[in-house]
Structure formats: C-alpha cells, structure tokens
C-alpha cells in the first residue's frame, strides 16, 4: 500500500500544473520560484543547510533548477525517544497549541475550535510543579487511624529514620547500565526539504542513522515522531529524487499551507501591535525599548533588526525622519516570502520534538 501511495504521490507532484502566481500572503502556499528564494535565504543564514541535486537527470523535476532540487542538512542529533515519559508528564493528552510562536501561553482562549491549523505540544498541559507540591503535602500528612476511625497524631519528621544512617547492602543495589535496551540513545538524522508541486508547499523527509555507517531501519524512525502523527501525518515513503527504493519518514504536506497561513496572520497581528506601540512613543529611546521588548513570530526572522532605529536616526519626535520611519513601518510585513522556510522549520519541529532542529539553525 505504501509503495502504491508513494508512486501516486510522486506522479501527482510531477503532473500537477505549475503555479507561477504568488498567493503567499493569502493561502500560505508558495511557487517553485519562491521555494528557491526561501531556500537561498535558508542556506545563506544557516550554512548547515545546502542545496542538492537529484541522483540522476531522470529524477529531476522541471520546475526547479538543476542543482537546486532539494535542501539537505546532515548529522542532526536526536538524543531521546518519544516514549510516555517524554516532556515530563506521562499519559497526558497532547495539547493543541495555536500560539506557540507568537509568544502565547497556550491557555484557555488561545485554542481555537478547529485543530487543523494548530500543532502539538507534548506533555505541557499541566503545571508539574504544582502537582509535585500537592503530592509532597499529602505524603507529609500521614496519620494513623484507630478502630473507632479517629485520626492519630501526625508523625514528626524526627521520628522518621534517616536512610543515610543505614548501611547499604551491596548485593541489593541495582546498578543502572549505560544502555539497557542494547540500542544507542543517540541517533542522527539527515533532513531533506523538497517542494510539493501538488500542495505548493515544502515537504520534509527524514533519514535516521544509529552511527555514521549504520542506517536506522525505517520503522524505528517512528520512535522519534509524536504519537498522534505516526502513520497519519507522518508515513514511510520512497524519496523521489534518489534512484531505487530509499525509505524515509515524511511529513505529509496536506495541512502545511493552512498552518503557515495561520502563522503569517498571527505574525502580522503581532507586528501591527508593535507598530501601534511605536506610534505612541515620544522618543527614539522609548521606541528602542518597545523594539527590544517585542518577541513573537516576527522576531524569528530578524524583523527586530529590520525595525530597529539605526544610528542615522537622530531626529527628535515629530521630525521628518521620525515620520519617515513610521511610514516605512506601515509598509513592512512580519514574515517575507524568503523567510518562509525558517518559520516552516519552527512549525515542523513540533512533529519531531526529540530531533534538535535548532542545531541546523546555528550560525
């Protein structure tokens, strides 16, 4: 079934009409030219990423330039598997987080009724510290009950023997081995970003390694995928740009455009709020404080630097230069199309939180 699905997906991308009209702001989709532009920006800003070509001319797609068929980064570390204890609270339901990149707290009022445009934050739904304090309080309040059901006096801490005063039985000590499963905990991944012509969005493929010379069996890659995404959003597919059958985990792009559109809208709203605050400032120093305090989505793509006042702006409030700055602010957007893949990787990291995507974005 997977072979048939991979084949149909590949031919659907190759035969779909190529769009040359930019609808980036309205739909979250990008054209092949915009994908190349965003890829060039990613490679420039983060040199761990690079462009790559298909393994043979027959595997190339016509709507992307030779040598720029896909993006690749290698040796991305993944230190832990996504078991029940990942991110702290075992057994918690995954929480839909709609405002992760806009600096929200993920509480009530931030989760919309349609979860398609959201993404998952694992194990963060409760205050683990508060639960721990309550549990300790219950442990401390241990009393005896007599036959009549009356509570006895609470034991004082002094009555409890100190475990450090007891001698350890060497034969009873269970020593933890370095590797109880027989499988090294550290894995590395090679990440590929391709362009899906049918969905008009990027698509991520992942290929894992147990060591530099030992590929990770494809089914074990699912251990590094958030549970709700396994075999649904993330499936095992053949990589279309390589000869032969090279299985990789792939994040299906069917919802990428709607998620990216949501991120764009939220980033623009955050930027508009910052603009409104700037209009109320009375001095350059006050404006600098507003810019430094602002976080959110626009901060991910160096918008703070673009918005900051340069040393050449020394005009007093009300001067021509100050008014020109405010006019320039009105023309800016939070996320430019060439910055698309930077935000895309931040979003896609929620599918594989154990893989250190930020490693690929170090300068």
UniProtKB/Swiss-Prot annotation:
Stored Pfam families: Autophagy_act_C (PF03987)
Regions that span the bilayer: none
Residues at the catalytic site: 254
Region (Handle region): 258-339
Segments for region (Flexible region): 85-176
Residue numbers spanned by region Disordered: 101-167
Extent of Acidic residues compositional bias: 153-167
Keywords, ordered alphabetically: Autophagy, Cytoplasm, Protein transport, Transport, Ubl conjugation pathway
Chief location of this protein within or outside the cell: cytoplasm
UniProt feature, compositional bias: Basic and acidic residues: 128-146
Entry coiled-coil feature ranges: none
Gene Ontology molecular function: Atg8-family ligase activity
Family: Belongs to the ATG3 family.
Domain remarks: The N-terminal region is involved in phosphatidylethanolamine-binding and is required for atg8-PE conjugation.
Descriptive protein name: Autophagy-related protein 3
Organism: Penicillium rubens (strain ATCC 28089 / DSM 1075 / NRRL 1951 / Wisconsin 54-1255) (Penicillium chrysogenum)
């Amino acid at each position: 079934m997977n072979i048939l699905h991979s084949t149909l997906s590949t031919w659907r991308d190759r035969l779909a009409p190529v769009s040359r009209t930019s609808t980036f702001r309205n739909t979250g989709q990008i054209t092949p030219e915009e994908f190349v532009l965003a890829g060039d920006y990613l490679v420039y800003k983060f040199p761990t990423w690079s462009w790559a070509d298909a393994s043979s001319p027959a595997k190339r797609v016509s709507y992307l330039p030779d040598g720029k068929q896909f993006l690749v980064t290698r040796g991305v570390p993944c230190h832990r598997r996504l078991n029940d204890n990942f991110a702290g609270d075992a057994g918690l339901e995954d929480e839909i987080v709609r405002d992760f990149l806009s600096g929200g707290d993920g509480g009530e009022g931030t989760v919309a009724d349609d979860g398609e445009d959201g993404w998952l934050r694992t194990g963060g739904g409760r205050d683990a510290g508060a639960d721990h304090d309550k549990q300790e309080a219950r442990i401390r309040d241990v009393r005896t009950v007599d036959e009549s059901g009356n509570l006895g006096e609470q034991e004082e801490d002094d009555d409890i023997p100190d475990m450090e005063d007891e001698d350890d039985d060497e034969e009873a000590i269970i020593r933890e081995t370095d590797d109880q499963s027989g499988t090294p905990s550290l894995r590395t991944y090679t990440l590929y970003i391709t362009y899906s012509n049918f969905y008009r969005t990027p698509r991520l493929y992942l290929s894992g390694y147990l060591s530099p010379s030992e590929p990770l069996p494809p089914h074990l890659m699912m251990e590094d995928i958030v549970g709700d995404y396994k075999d649904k959003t993330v499936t095992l597919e053949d990589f279309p740009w390589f000869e032969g059958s090279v299985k990789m985990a792939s994040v299906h792009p069917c919802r990428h455009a709607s998620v990216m559109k949501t991120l764009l809208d939220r980033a623009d709203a955050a930027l508009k709020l910052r603009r409104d605050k700037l209009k109320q400032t009375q001095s350059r120093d006050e404006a600098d404080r507003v810019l430094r305090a602002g976080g959110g989505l626009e901060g991910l793509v160096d918008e703070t630097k673009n918005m900051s006042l340069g040393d050449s702006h020394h005009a007093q409030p009300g001067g021509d230069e100050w008014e020109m700055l405010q006019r320039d602010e009105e023309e800016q957007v939070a996320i430019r199309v060439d910055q698309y893949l930077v935000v895309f990787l931040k979003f896609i990291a929620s599918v594989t939180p154990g893989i250190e995507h930020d490693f690929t974005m170090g300068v």
